[in-house]
A protein has these predicted regions:
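Second-shell loop/turn segments in exported
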Residues: 1-3, 18-23, 83-92, 106-111, ...
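Mature, Sec-exported extracytoplasmic domains of Gram-positive
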Residues: 3-5, 21, 44, 49, ...
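Extracytoplasmic/secreted envelope proteins and their assembly/folding machinery
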Residues: 6-14, 29-33, 37, 75-79, ...
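Flexible, polar/acidic helix-loop-strand segments at domain edges
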Residues: 34-115
Length: 227
């Protein structure tokens, strides 16, 4: 097995969520930073300061990502925004990571990401790999383009929904299946009016998530992603 870590992770995810994962892509932290730089960065509305550095590291917390509207993050700052652990909870960090992924989906052109991803892989300086066959690239690009116009939902298997020390795997699989089924139904063409709280082009939504921010049917309403 060429990538045993990837295969082990894939197997755990499939068993836990009840999903079949056909393809994967892997990029290390330096490669991620380089990819974000290569596509021109991402923009996010940031609600609170995010520290750069570690209280346990030699430099400590040495800088901050400041809050603001439509903040542009390069690769270095996008990586720290997603992974910073100080002065926050694991659940808050999970949400920041989801917001980064949502921003990438909304703002980046799939064909550009593919080109830059391949360029980074060819350079050989970072760990970049995928099992996606060349013949499936066009299909994945089409899916990515369709995904840009759809809301990204989120569910986190954390307390009180799931107890980490004694997870109910049957419940997890049921929730995943229900979420996917609901998203497929909502994506179907409908003559009904737009849901309340949805944003129209050029406007912003003020809808609050019905539960916690990590449990939402539309990350745009939580992350305020700039398009």
């Amino acid at each position: 097995v060429k990538y045993p870590g990837v295969e082990a992770t894939k197997g755990v995810i499939e068993e836990t969520l009840g999903l079949k994962i056909n393809y994967w892509a892997m990029i290390d932290l330096k490669g991620f930073q380089q990819l974000i730089n290569a596509v021109g960065g991402i923009r996010l509305d940031i609600g609170k300061r995010v520290p750069i550095g570690s209280l346990h590291g030699p430099k400590g917390v040495y800088d901050w990502i400041e809050p603001g509207k439509n903040v542009k993050l390069d690769g270095f700052h996008a990586l720290w925004f997603a992974r910073s652990r100080e002065y926050s909870t694991d659940y808050e960090r999970m949400l920041r990571q989801k917001c980064v992924m949502n921003a990438m989906l909304r703002q980046l052109k799939p064909e550009t990401v593919l080109t830059k991803f391949q360029a980074i892989a060819d350079a050989g300086e970072q760990i970049v790999a995928t099992n996606l066959p060349a013949g499936e690239i066009g299909t994945m690009l089409d899916l990515a383009m369709k995904g840009k116009s759809q809301p990204m939902g989120s569910v986190s298997f954390t307390p009180p929904l799931i107890v980490p020390m004694n997870p109910d795997f049957a419940k997890i699989r049921r929730i995943v299946a229900e979420k996917i089924a609901a998203s497929e139904q909502s994506a179907a063409p409908s003559a009904s009016a737009s849901p309340s709280g949805s944003a129209t082009p050029g406007s912003s939504t003020t809808t609050k998530p019905k539960s916690t921010k990590n449990q939402t049917d539309n990350l745009d309403s939580v992350c305020k992603v700039s398009s």
